[in-house]
Amino acid sequence: MILGIDVGSTTTKMVLMEDSKIIWYKIEDIGVVIEEDILLKMVKEIEQKYPIDKIVATGYGRHKVSFADKIVPEVIALGKGANYFFNEADGVIDIGGQDTKVLKIDKNGKVVDFILSDKCAAGTGKFLEKALDILKIDKNEINKYKSDNIAKISSMCAVFAESEIISLLSKKVPKEGILMGVYESIINRVIPMTNRLKIQNIVFSGGVAKNKVLVEMFEKKLNKKLLIPKEPQIVCCVGAILV
């Protein structure tokens, strides 16, 4: 059995696979700040239930897994993981905490081309997280907030966009409308990236893909359905195992 560990900026994902089948997985709400001894302890707990033959690491905080047998770059892992879940995929959108990645892949999941957004852009998972903090919206309640009145957030920079959110709140603009504006801001940063790579069958991976309202807006803007795995947060981890 192979254990994959994907240490992201905000979450850590672990997946156990045998003969290309997912046996077990877990998602922890702690990312790159996780200590290596904590990771080792988690691995030892898994080893009490399953025999681990090999450990592979990926993600923004992959350096925290120095005990891994193999390190796989995120972009390569994402392509392979997307292909595992949807073999018709020719593209991937991954909105991570630190950046947004858009990939063009071939029929084997090999990355042909990719674009990374600026980590300072108002289009990352971290920006969405910060917006939720300002709006005092629990991330677990996020799908309850929806509105047809979309507030305009025009800044390309996350810091200035956050200032716009505070300004809109002070003007008594409803939270729902501001949140929809945040979604639109994120989507508007990603669509030019997908257009540039000319991708059609797109896998949406990462925690943001669990946001039903954002996905609905995204699909409307793209005029197509996105391919979303049952658990979109483990795509990169699965791909790292399969590389």
Curated annotation (Swiss-Prot):
This is Uncharacterized protein MJ0004. Homodimer. Keywords: 4Fe-4S, Iron, Iron-sulfur, Metal-binding. [4Fe-4S] cluster binds at C120, C157. It comes from the Archaea. Pfam families: BcrAD_BadFG (PF01869). GO terms for molecular function: 4 iron, 4 sulfur cluster binding; metal ion binding. PANTHER family: BIFUNCTIONAL PROTEIN [INCLUDES 2-HYDROXYACYL-COA DEHYDRATASE (N-TER) AND ITS ACTIVATOR DOMAIN (C_TERM) (PTHR32329:SF2), BIFUNCTIONAL PROTEIN [INCLUDES 2-HYDROXYACYL-COA DEHYDRATASE (N-TER) AND ITS ACTIVATOR DOMAIN (C_TERM)-RELATED (PTHR32329). Binds 1 [4Fe-4S] cluster per dimer. Its cofactor is [4Fe-4S] cluster.
